[in-house]
Design a protein with these regions (language model features):
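Transition-metal
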Residues: 1-164, 224-264, 268, 299, ...
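Intrinsically disordered, low-complexity terminal tails and inter-domain linkers enriched
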Residues: 52-82, 260-285, 334-362
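Ligand-binding loop in jelly-roll beta-barrel domains
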Residues: 107, 115-120, 139, 150-153, ...
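Glycine- and acidic-residue-biased ligand/ion/polar-headgroup-sensing regions
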Residues: 117-119, 142-143, 147-165, 169, ...
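Loop-centered beta-sheet repeat module
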Residues: 174-220
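Short acidic-glycine-tyrosine-enriched beta hairpin
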Residues: 182-193, 360-377
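Basic, glycine-rich polyanion-binding accessory segments appended to enzymes
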Residues: 256-263, 281-328
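Active-site pocket scaffolds in enzymes
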Residues: 322, 333, 364-367, 371-375, ...
Length: 402
């Protein structure tokens, strides 16, 4: 099985910073760099994907101590979108790579970003599918955030403090007092927020996070602090549409607690009401937690300590996306034996193994890099030290609701 390296589409917005370039190794000709779309088949920011020529790992990829070395890389260096082929075109030619769960969608359902908010983003809301399809001819947007870094005192806005009428909200916008209606949430690295369509929200200044979202770029901007772009123009607001789609009810205490979490749990323990994946662990110092799930994505967060080893299954049901949040490691993917016939003509599967007869790929991975494993029967493993985000599709819809 070939491992695909994703080269992100880079977005330059007025609120962006330099951390994605300086700390996460994202290559971009423009600064400030606000967003890196590290898994995207969207027309507004199509990532690119490249594969190794021989699906082999260079000699000397691991030292005698078992730690990863950059000598084992077989991809082109750099993360510019000039590398590889269009991810959207790749999926068009290989629709099976998404997996059987993806057949429910007319498009690749998931989009993943790294976001560096040096300045605050606008306060905004996203419509659901029903409204977006009827009014915009495109899909809505549900998303989740995983906070990676924050400056001292950094916060975000997330839902309303109490129930408000449309008139009260409209008046607050006109009087430039809209932020006072919202829940102001102080953040710490590791916090997770699940944001259903219709929830008013905004990333505050000094926050760097990963965003996993529905494959949509539809945003209704409600409030932008009166600021202007490089040409001296204020950015367009979408107040009327926003008022139609926003959930004006109070964000309940239950919901705030459920959507803001920290910590890590050993594999096998329950996390956020769902059991961990149940995949096998060969060594200690491995932690896995389910941090979010809906029909468009399921997300697990994996912690490896002291060069630990983790192994999981690959299936024909879903692709697997791996985003390195911190640290480094060696990623391996293998396919199973092919089906063979018994000499007497009856079909028979050989015992499932992962020997040299199957295709095997291996590569060194590090902070800020994104990888795509196509849907196929097999297994994958990761050995190293760090934090990793695993995204895939699952059959069960686990969106939390009040």
């Amino acid at each position: 099985m070939a491992i695909g390296k994703i080269h992100p589409a880079c977005k330059q917005y007025l609120w962006g910073g330099e951390k994605l370039i300086r700390e996460y190794g994202i290559s971009s000709p423009n600064t400030p760099l606000a967003e890196a779309w590290v898994l995207s088949a969207h027309s507004d920011g199509d990532s690119r994907i490249s594969f190794s020529d021989e699906a082999r790992f260079s000699e000397g990829a691991e030292s005698s101590e078992g730690t990863a070395s950059s000598e084992g890389r077989f991809f082109s260096e750099g993360d510019s979108c000039s590398h590889g082929e269009s991810f959207a075109e790749y999926l068009k030619c290989h629709p099976e790579a998404v997996g059987s769960f993806g057949k429910a969608f007319p498009f690749f359902p998931t989009l993943i970003k790294l976001i560096d908010a040096k300045k605050a983003l606008s306060i905004q809301v996203h419509p659901d599918d029903s409204f977006a399809l009827s009014r915009e001819g495109q899909y809505g947007k549900t998303e989740m955030w995983i906070v990676l870094e924050r400056e001292e005192g950094a916060f975000l806005y997330f839902g309303f403090q109490k129930d408000y009428t449309e008139e009260e909200i409209r008046r607050a916008i006109e009087e430039e007092n809209f932020p006072s209606l919202l829940c102001k949430v102080m953040v710490e690295p590791g916090d997770v927020f699940f944001i259903p369509a219709g929830t008013v929200h905004a990333i505050g200044a000094g926050i760097l996070l990963a965003e996993v979202q529905q494959n949509s770029n539809l945003t209704y901007r409600v409030y932008d602090y009166g600021r202007k772009d490089a040409q001296g123009n204020t950015r367009e607001l979408h107040v009327e549409k926003a008022l139609e789609v926003m959930n004006r009810k109070q964000l309940s205490a239950y919901r705030q607690e459920a959507f803001k979490k920290q910590g890590k749990k050993p594999v096998g323990e329950k996390a956020t009401g769902e059991s961990a994946t149940g995949e096998k662990v060969a060594e200690k110092n491995v932690y896995l937690e389910r941090i979010g799930s809906c029909e468009y994505f399921t997300v697990d967060r994996l912690f490896l300590e002291e060069n630990a080893f983790y192994s999981g299954k690959l299936t024909e049901e879903s692709f697997l996306s791996l985003l390195v949040l911190e640290g480094e490691g060696v990623l391996t993917a293998e396919t199973k034996h092919a089906k063979e016939n018994h000499p007497d003509g009856s079909p028979e599967y050989k015992e499932e193994t992962y020997s040299s007869k199957g295709q095997k790929s291996k590569c060194f991975v590090k902070k800020g890099e994104s990888y795509f494993l196509p849907a196929e029967e097999g297994q994958w493993s990761l050995k190293g030290t760090g934090k990793f985000l695993l995204t895939f599709l699952s059959e069960k819809d686990c969106v939390r609701k009040d």
